[in-house]
């Protein structure tokens, strides 16, 4: 099980940052072009000085070499990231679906990796950022799986397989994911006690996270709060696509769907 208080990285916003956007759980995949197009349009037109992606940008990631195929979906996603990074800072945190995104891909796209968790210092306040999956302590089976696939040994073994074999495994994962979606599988929620411990250790008052697909604000007591990001699904009815925007006035949800 995850440590209740993991080491917290630091991100200090430069003085020129006025607008910071947070997104997560887009689960980009070739079979859902509407969501990809909405994301590409958002990335091209957001007024933010920085876009912080807090996990699960991709439905699955089978290795950085997938983006080297010029006609691949991964290459199209890389092009969007590269283009956005020319005009604003782009940061990426691993989620439970895209934990194999590597430094080679991020460097090629001029995207900066974010540790989970990271404390953002912005406008005189500290905001704790996490994907959120490590805080879902009731999901014991998942946390065991997470520990396995995050190990260097497992990742080295998986990435040593041919790309097409890894893609086949990914297709199987997507099939299972669709089955869970249609079955109405409910995501485990963040453990509020653990969230408070993380916040206190980071000397922050608000946790911003994704993963659970339950956008909301929660009062955790003792002046501590959590804000949950929305997932994106432009094929759903109604559409779901939302940005959490931070300025010196605070947080604001920006619906895109």
Annotate each language-model stretch with its function:
Residues 1-13:
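A short, compositionally biased domain-edge/stem linker segment
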Residues 130-191:
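Active-site-proximal loop/helix segment associated with metal-binding centers of metalloenzymes
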Residues 108-117, 126-128, 133, 139-140, ...:
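Conserved beta-sheet core of the metallophosphoesterase superfamily
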Residues 24-27, 56-57, 96-98, 132-134, ...:
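Active-site metal-binding loops of divalent metal-dependent hydrolases
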């Amino acid at each position: 099980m995850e440590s209740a208080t993991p080491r917290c990285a630091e991100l200090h916003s430069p003085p020129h940052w006025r607008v910071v956007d947070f997104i997560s759980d887009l689960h980009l995949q070739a079979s859902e072009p509407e969501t990809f197009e909405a994301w590409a349009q958002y990335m091209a037109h957001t007024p933010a000085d920085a876009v912080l992606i807090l996990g699960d940008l991709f439905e699955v990631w089978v290795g950085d070499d997938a983006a080297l195929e010029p006609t691949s979906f991964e290459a199209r996603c890389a092009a969007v990231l590269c283009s956005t990074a020319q005009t604003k800072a782009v940061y990426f945190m691993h989620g439970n679906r895209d934990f194999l995104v590597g430094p080679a891909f991020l460097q090629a796209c001029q995207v900066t990796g974010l540790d989970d968790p990271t404390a953002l210092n912005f406008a005189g306040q500290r905001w704790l950022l996490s994907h959120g999956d490590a805080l879902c302590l009731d999901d014991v089976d998942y946390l065991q799986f997470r520990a396995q696939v995050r190990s260097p040994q497992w990742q080295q073994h998986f990435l040593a397989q041919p790309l097409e074999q890894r893609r086949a495994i990914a297709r199987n994962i997507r099939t299972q994911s669709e089955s869970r979606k249609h079955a109405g599988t409910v995501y485990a929620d963040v453990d509020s006690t653990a969230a408070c411990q993380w916040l206190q250790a980071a000397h922050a008052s608000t946790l911003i996270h994704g993963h659970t697909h339950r956008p909301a604000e929660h009062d955790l007591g003792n002046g501590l709060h959590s804000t949950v990001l929305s997932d994106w699904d432009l094929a759903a009815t109604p559409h779901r696509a939302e940005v959490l925007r931070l300025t010196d006035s605070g947080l604001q949800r920006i619906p895109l769907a």
